[in-house]
Structure formats: C-alpha cells, structure tokens
C-alpha cells in the first residue's frame, strides 16, 4: 500500500445522500443501502487519480463506506461488504491494503470466475491474503504517473481483463509465479532492496 496519494474524506449523518460527484455519490448510496441508514453528507478532501493502476475504485468505495458507517456509529467491515460495493472480485489486494497496508499477495479467484462466468455484484468473496510483508522503512518508492490517456474503465475494462485471463499463456503464467515465489517475496521478507528491485522490474516486463 502507498501512503500517498490517497483518499481522504469525512461523512455526517443526513436524510439523503450528498456527495461532490457521481462516483462518490454512487458508492455513498450503496453504502447507505448496505448499512440500512437514511443518508450521509460526504466531504472529500483528497482523491486518487482514476484509471492509472492505483486501485482508485476500491479505495474510494471502501473509504466512503467506512466513513458513513462510522458517522452512523456502526462498525465498518470492509472485507465483508466489499463485494456488495462491487469491489474485491478479481483481486483482494485493494481490500487488504485498505485494511492494513503492506506488500500483499492474495490467493486470487478460480480463472473462470470472472471470464466465462461473470458473477453479479456481491456474488463473490474477497480472496484471502496469502502473504503480507512490511517493507523496510528506509525503502523509498517513487511513483511516476505518465501524462497520457487514462486506462480503460467500465465494461470495456472488464472485457479486456477477461480476455487477458482467458488468453494467458500457461508458460508465461508459470514463469511469473516462479518469479514471485522464488525471488520477489523472499527479497521483500529479507529486506534485500537490490534483489527486490530486480525481481519487480522483471515482473513488470513479463506482466
């Protein structure tokens, strides 16, 4: 998980839903339905850029849900309610980093779950965390977002992801899996920055 950029917002109880734009309003309405509350006023202070690979949808949804739950004196359970918000289906990494942060590997879903058989919103469980490591405090991550056209979204993004999973080469998948298990995770656990950086760069080229 990254400390910056991030989503920062607050919520107050209300009779209806009031949010600064359609994205936050959608998640606020879903959250109010899940929590069975009449509404909330949502005030957004910081937000993530969308469609640049930072998981902005999941962080926005869970942040909005959590703020509204607390505003109504309810205990938020983001992992339980992420599917009802349409999040945590293909990957549980976004939910796990929202919960605790860290360097996360999740257990994933069966390969046909979001390809041939696309479930309805809420009809899945968030994949559990397989491995979580705290990266050394002395490490610094530089995040560079190109000034380019944002990535795909909505159903176009969904079709692209389903196609990528369906058409994936088994040999390449095995190579990536071996890289993660044999190099990336051990170097993270040991705090070996050089080995971690080399493995991460290789992962980026293969993926």
Regions found by a protein language model. Give the residues of each.
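ATP-dependent small-molecule kinase catalytic core of the GHMP/sugar-kinase superfamily
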Residues: 77-207
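ATP-binding N-lobe of GHMP and related small-molecule kinases
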Residues: 1-56, 66-78, 83, 89, ...
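Catalytic nucleophile loop
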Residues: 55-57, 95-96
């Amino acid at each position: 998980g990254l400390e910056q950029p991030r989503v920062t917002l607050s919520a107050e109880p209300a009779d209806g839903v009031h949010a600064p734009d359609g994205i936050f309003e959608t998640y606020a309405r879903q959250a109010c339905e899940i929590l069975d509350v009449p509404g909330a006023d949502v005030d957004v202070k910081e937000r993530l850029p969308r469609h640049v690979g930072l998981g902005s949808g999941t962080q926005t949804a869970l942040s909005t849900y959590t703020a509204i739950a607390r505003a109504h004196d309810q205990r938020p359970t983001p992992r339980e309610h992420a599917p009802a918000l349409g999040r945590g289906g293909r990957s549980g990494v976004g939910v796990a980093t929202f919960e605790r942060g860290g360097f996360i590997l999740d257990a994933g879903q069966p390969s046909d779950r979001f390809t041939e058989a696309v479930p309805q919103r809420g009809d899945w469980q968030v994949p559990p965390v397989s491995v979580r490591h705290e990266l050394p405090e002395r490490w610094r991550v530089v995040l560079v977002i190109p000034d380019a056209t944002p990535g795909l979204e909505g159903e176009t993004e969904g079709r692209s992801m389903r196609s990528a999973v369906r058409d994936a080469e088994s040999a390449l998948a095995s190579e990536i899996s071996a890289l993660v298990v044999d190099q990336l995770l051990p170097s993270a656990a040991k705090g070996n920055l050089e080995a971690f950086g080399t493995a991460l760069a290789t992962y980026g080229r293969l993926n």
